[in-house]
Amino acid sequence: MHQYSGTVLAREPDFDKNIRRKYGAPFVDLHRVDLQRALYDRAQELGVKFQLDERVENVDPAGPSVTTKSGHKYDADLVVGADGLWSRTRQCFLGTADEPKPTGDLAYRIVLSLSQIEDPVLRLWISKPEVHFWIGPRSHAVGYSLKGGNMYNIVLLVPDDLPPGVAKESGNVEEMKKLFEGWDPV
């Protein structure tokens, strides 16, 4: 953990080993697409049938079954609700609308490819499988390696100033630079 200026505030050596020891499983940073692909591939190996391009109309947890907008009903052993922020599956299970709750944070996301980085110090930083946090006034940042150290994900969090009802908007690079002026250059 770093102060926004770069000063190290705390460090946990062997974080991944400690996680494995404590939980009996590894700590892994994955790109969401890689996780989705791994789950999809394994499910196919186990014989799961996928029906793509269907909208869920209803989920009956007692069945369990799923009924789509086109009227098809699918009986299942298990229904996995992984349909995102505005989840219809969650709404069906709860029996009521469950809109996302604002966190007060707005996230700028940046993914860098190691091949794009020329600075040797930054290349070494990115290639290490470590998670870094920076804490600053009214903002914080998280950075970690992806794809075996070939990519680096950075999430910059600032107070949310989007209008009500707007969940996503193109970022403004100049605004972001201003918000993080004086921060650790790494």
Q: What residue spans do the PLM features occupy?
A:
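Active-site-adjacent segment of FAD-dependent monooxygenases/related oxidoreductases
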Residues: 1-42, 46, 57, 134
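Conserved FAD-binding catalytic core of PHBH/FMO-like flavoproteins
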Residues: 37-186
